[in-house]
Amino acid sequence: MLTFLIPTAKEMTIPKESHPHLLPQDSQAILKIMAAMTTEDLAKSYRIKEESAKKEQQRWQDMASQQSLAYPAYQLFNGLMYRHIKRDKLTTQEQAYLTQQVYITSSFYGIIPANHPIAEHRHDFHTRIKIEGQSLKSYWRPCYNQFAKEHPQVISLLSSEFDDVFSKDCKQLWISPKFMAEKEGQFKTHSTISKKARGAFLTACMENNCQTVDSLKSLVFAGFYYHPDLSTDHEFVYIKKEA
């Protein structure tokens, strides 16, 4: 069985379905620090304006006082990649695939199933805080490595931000898809192409119920197709021709 890892997103939209917010034990130490920060501290940590930091401060304090609602993560996050993932009108098989084989890597919650209930928050591995004297990446590394040991065949749709959260020896069987546009024999990639393609790729995997590495090679989605000559055992390259 394939396991997919996807990142979080800064952009969020409130879905209809809500739940009580139950915070994992490993996240409590982070919440304690974030909820105690001033708007000035948050502005520096996030590299945002103080006006925006006030909104984030309220979210953290609501969580600390257990007043936050929680929403299925894959529905709450609404960044470019998420908007290209099929999230509505799923078949029973697609819903099972999304909730049982897709996991979200978070610097606040750890690694969670795609439908895990989470609260509105802003947090990533660039957030400048220390947890028990450790960086966020060091703090989460044991948890992330344990997940990798339990799920050896991972299809990673993660950005470079996560490269050194996992130890290298945990990623021996990982495959990272790469998405490129071809025009007049020239190949190019950029974040917009990649984010849209990640969502479309995951949707195609769900719709085709891909369960083996070889099944990924036959996928055609949003104009992309597998390119064997550019691919390696650990990097599957998908090309889209541009006019």
From Swiss-Prot:
UniProt-listed InterPro entries: YaaA (IPR005583)
In Pfam terms, one family for this protein is H2O2_YaaD
Example GO CC term: the record gives: cytosol
Give all cystine bridges in this chain. Answer: none
The biological processes this protein is annotated with in GO are: response to hydroperoxide
Tell me where on the tree of life, at the top rank, the source sits.
Answer: Bacteria
Family designation: Belongs to the UPF0246 family.
Q: What name does this protein carry?
A: UPF0246 protein SPy_2104/M5005_Spy1788
Q: What is the lineage of its organism?
A: Bacteria, Bacillati, Bacillota, Bacilli, Lactobacillales
